[in-house]
Amino acid sequence: MSGTVLIMAGGTGGHVFPALAVADQLRTRGFDILWLGAENGMEGNLVRQYGYEIAELSVSRLRGGGIKRKLTAPFNLLRAVLQARQLIRARQPVLAVGFGGFASGPGGLAARLCKVPVVVHEQNAVPGLTNRLLSRLSTVTLEGFQGAFGHPQACWVGNPVRPQITALEEPARRYAQHQGGLRVLVLGGSQGALVLNQDLPELLLAVLGRDIQVRHQCGAGRTAEAAPIYQALGLQAQVSEFIDDMAEAYGWADLVICRAGALTVAEVAAAGVAALFVPLPSAVDDHQTLNARWLSERGAALLLPQRDLGAVSLAGTLKPVAERGLLAQIAERAREQAMADSAERAATLCEEVANGR
């Protein structure tokens, strides 16, 4: 059996990229893909670049905001549900799969109203509001981190990552080929992380010395936050707004210093690279700390809260492992935690639901 699968994801790359990986798998199995996103969402252009049709709902954030947003939220939600229901009636999908984002909630609710089965995939160690609600309506619930939903019916499939990352050479062989000073890859995310851009260069010099090699992804329009600091310190650093080839960057690095979004944690594990996670302290439900602990509690990563990001704490965390051979051991343990076939597992369960099994 084939048919149309409605993929509901948007808002951040952490929702969209895992959804794209599963969509690619479903497409190879003969399903047509229709994407459901939000008007003016980042997913619009990205999804079209991957060759998928996208429909957009008039919907925005439901959680947080001022009194006006709280008062209008029920009406905006109802409007989005009605829009989604009209689309579903017209296109008759055999399955709706929600990954999170503004459109996922209204789309999932509309799907259930139209008697279309729903599958939910939660990327983080703590489910977001939309997925917590949708999981009560879903036929199958999928977890990126085992135990996220806290009930045995949920299926742990991991977080899908790009195949170029899972295809990287094994860490021990890769690290053995690295030459020169330690290679440090700093990832601030697509929007950048001010504390990593402004504070980390001086801390790296103080803790690891001048011989290190640095690549620093600082976020759109934020090169001026980091590049002049490296230059003033005399540190060898390549600063860029974005990194197009993440697989190559992970393969180059001995150590990654980054936030702990679900996708980043999954990529670190899949690549097999040592990482120091500095979780975003304002993340909802502190989910980034819990994401990072999935690896750090297994000796497969390092974890340092942002409030402790100073020379003394950073030295205490990094100096005991600041040798390429020791970092390679952490990288090996990280890769042992990866689920390389996550996209295939998720697609198989989706296919079974779509086929009524």
Swiss-Prot record:
Pathway: Cell wall biogenesis; peptidoglycan biosynthesis. GO terms for biological process: carbohydrate metabolic process; cell division; cell wall organization; lipid glycosylation; peptidoglycan biosynthetic process; regulation of cell shape. One of its GO terms (molecular function) is UDP-N-acetyl-D-glucosamine:N-acetylmuramoyl-L-alanyl-D-glutamyl-meso-2,6-diaminopimelyl-D-alanyl-D-alanine-diphosphoundecaprenol 4-beta-N-acetylglucosaminlytransferase activity. It is found in: Cell inner membrane. UDP-N-acetyl-alpha-D-glucosamine binds at residues 12-14, 124, 162, 190, 243, 262-267, 288. It catalyses: di-trans,octa-cis-undecaprenyl diphospho-N-acetyl-alpha-D-muramoyl-L-alanyl-D-glutamyl-meso-2,6-diaminopimeloyl-D-alanyl-D-alanine + UDP-N-acetyl-alpha-D-glucosamine = di-trans,octa-cis-undecaprenyl diphospho-[N-acetyl-alpha-D-glucosaminyl-(1->4)]-N-acetyl-alpha-D-muramoyl-L-alanyl-D-glutamyl-meso-2,6-diaminopimeloyl-D-alanyl-D-alanine + UDP + H(+). Its main location: membrane. It is a peripheral membrane protein. Coiled coil: none annotated. The keyword NAD does not apply. Belongs to the glycosyltransferase 28 family. MurG subfamily. This is UDP-N-acetylglucosamine--N-acetylmuramyl-(pentapeptide) pyrophosphoryl-undecaprenol N-acetylglucosamine transferase. It comes from Alcanivorax borkumensis (strain ATCC 700651 / DSM 11573 / NCIMB 13689 / SK2). The lineage of its organism: Bacteria, Pseudomonadati, Pseudomonadota, Gammaproteobacteria, Oceanospirillales.
